[in-house]
Design a protein with these regions (language model features):
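Charged, flexible boundary elements
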Residues: 1-10
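Aspartic protease core domain of the pepsin/retropepsin superfamily
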Residues: 17, 25, 29-112
Length: 112
């Protein structure tokens, strides 16, 4: 396997099994494509309003639809995580960013 391949896992989001979850240490926040909202048992009315604008790697900016908190379970680790919900056609079903990675202690964090 190439070291340049992305890391996709299968996890549980608020009790729902979800595959193609991307772990991305380059992302400051965790993202949930809007199309996944109902699949994890949530409704657009559950979103907390936000002024966050997400900018992707190409520089395109998209206003977030809102925030939703989901319980993320990976192995024996379980943590409530705030996801920024965005309109997206991404190939992943959820993205776990540095907020989640460091929150579960998956990678030690050091400021240089």
């Amino acid at each position: 396997m190439s070291h340049l391949c992305s890391l996709h896992i299968t996890t549980t989001l608020s009790g729902i099994r979800v595959n193609k979850v991307l772990i991305d240490g380059g992302a400051a926040i965790s993202l949930l494509p809007e199309r996944m909202l109902r699949k994890v048992g949530k409704h657009p009315d559950d979103l907390v309003p936000t002024n966050i604008v997400v900018t992707d790697f190409s520089g395109t900016s998209t206003p977030a639809r809102g925030l939703v908190t989901l319980t993320v379970k990976v192995g024996s680790s379980e943590r409530n995580t705030v996801f920024v919900v965005v309109p997206s056609r991404a190939s992943y079903n959820a993205l776990l960013g540095r907020d989640w990675i460091h929150g579960v202690g998956a990678v030690p964090f050091a400021v240089h």
